[in-house]
Amino acid sequence: MFWLLALLAYLLGSLSFAIVLSRLSGSPDPRSSGSGNAGATNMLRLAGRKLAILTLLGDLCKGLLPVLLARAAGLDLHAQAWVGICAVLGHLFPLYFRFKGGKGVATAAGMLMALYFPAALLAIGAWLLTFYLTRTSSLAALIATPLTLPLLAWREPEALLPISVLTVMIVWRHRNNLRDLFAGRERHF
């Protein structure tokens, strides 16, 4: 059951709402325009608030639904977390879009919502505060994601390893943003 759910999670994660919505609306492809990222922040820049919100909600659901399905199937929290990771991998490397996807932040947030809601609230709160103070989405993601680790280690230790892997994946996907942050070239809103 785990492997079937992991495959389904990857396939669902591979559905890129940013790419689909940009095609349907006639907006530029987010992979080749703006920041080059197929995610909600770039959709906000390229296509406006409405499509950015739809992208965000779709990406959140891609992380949330597979974990809830894994829970309904009776998988333990550790296995649920790995199923969620498969959804994030689908978002990062989508089968349907030549393996060029987004950075996984919203999909990871959806996954966290299903795994341990207080960790998701912590991450979302940290993201919002950092973004409010800096107007920099990438910095907000880089600060918010690892903040969940101590809370999970304390309250849900069986999810710590998969969430640590998730944190590394998200930081790795933001490596160009890190370079731009240190060079003072990162985009702000």
Curated annotation (Swiss-Prot):
Q: Which domain of life is it from?
A: Bacteria
Which keywords does UniProt give here? Cell inner membrane, Cell membrane, Lipid biosynthesis, Lipid metabolism, Membrane, Phospholipid biosynthesis, Phospholipid metabolism, Transferase, Transmembrane, Transmembrane helix
MF terms from GO for this chain are:
acyl-phosphate glycerol-3-phosphate acyltransferase activity
| One family name in Pfam for this protein | G3P_acyltransf
Q: Where in the cell is it found?
A: Cell inner membrane
Biological processes annotated in GO? phospholipid biosynthetic process
Q: What is its EC number?
A: 2.3.1.275
Q: How does it sit in the membrane?
A: Multi-pass membrane protein
Q: In which pathway does it act?
A: Lipid metabolism; phospholipid metabolism
Give TM segment ranges: 1-21, 50-70, 77-97, 111-131, 151-171
Task: List the GO terms this entry assigns under cellular component, sorted alphabetically.
Answer: plasma membrane
Q: What class of enzyme is it?
A: transferase
Asked if Secreted is a keyword of the record, the answer is no
Give the reaction(s) catalysed: an acyl phosphate + sn-glycerol 3-phosphate = a 1-acyl-sn-glycero-3-phosphate + phosphate
Q: How does it assemble?
A: Probably interacts with PlsX.
Task performed by this protein: Catalyzes the transfer of an acyl group from acyl-phosphate (acyl-PO(4)) to glycerol-3-phosphate (G3P) to form lysophosphatidic acid (LPA). This enzyme utilizes acyl-phosphate as fatty acyl donor, but not acyl-CoA or acyl-ACP.
Q: Which family does it belong to?
A: Belongs to the PlsY family.
Q: What is this protein called?
A: Glycerol-3-phosphate acyltransferase
